[in-house]
């Protein structure tokens, strides 16, 4: 039997088993590190010689049980690991493992488990979330650094591409985005990002690597403050760059709907426009919630007879005439007062995208929400 723990910047790999198995896993990890080092040198023009990166990793291998079991604490009740997970095509994605947390631990709510950890009625001890905005390889999405994020695809086409990777793979869900946003708020590390044409609007020195002929930046190319916990190992680019799909929340004819808990992660959950996977978002007493838009003002309430229009404003100017732990778990509230809230409550269906884009300035952010987006839309600013 053998054990190994490899660390490379924010990426780690742990393996335990027969020596041959552990050796193969270590070799695969070191091969990825070498490729990453070469990509970094090529894309960043780094002066530092990274050719000996595998040797650096070898020197960091830890074989004692205590070190292997140790995990980094990121917030009360929340832990994560960074791991490489391979899909059915044999290509890795860099993923965070988040461990189960309750609403009480996360934002002072009830003792209920956060909905991101409840899938198909089963409570999971852990879930995995992409570290990077996804890029496309042979029609499948992957979480990899220093890549161009995928755009010009509809949410449903993107979701199906994710499901095609094999069991467990899925598009980022609204419940999972809520977990990330609530965790950032709890930590006091609301992420910065590409909000001003490859720079952060709050400090022009914070910038990512710009993609030629665009204002988008390569995935994970910004500083540590561009992650959910302000560490190099955090989840990147939740603020700005491109709007991101958050599958499982919509507004239809002014009413708010969501997939139950994190069932948007399941391919069998029917989230077509008339699908039975949609459930009303409710207040603390179980009343369905609606969004009224009148005179460029947005109000969340329980009244079905609402004024229907469309507009956008800062979350700090949104009226919340309801008490809903579900909205809090989904991070649909003024966690960032300047972040934008855009709503279309007119007739029809509009799905949720989040985070803001490269030109949204202070209106971008992990709490920025856009319920203004028909499911048939595809464009260069979201994906």
Where does each model-flagged region fall?
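Charged, compositionally biased non-catalytic regions
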Residues: 54-80
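C-terminal, surface-exposed recognition/capping segments
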Residues: 59, 63, 178, 203-207, ...
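Extracellular adhesion/carbohydrate-recognition regions
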Residues: 78-168, 253-300, 382
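Short secondary-structure boundary/capping segments
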Residues: 185-190, 250, 259-261
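Short aromatic-cysteine micro-motif
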Residues: 112-238, 242, 269, 382
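Interface-prone segments of viral and bacterial extracellular assemblies
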Residues: 50, 54-57, 73, 159, ...
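Compositionally biased, non-globular sequence tracts
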Residues: 1-57
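A short local loop/turn or secondary-structure capping micro-motif enriched for an aromatic residue
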Residues: 22-24, 252-255
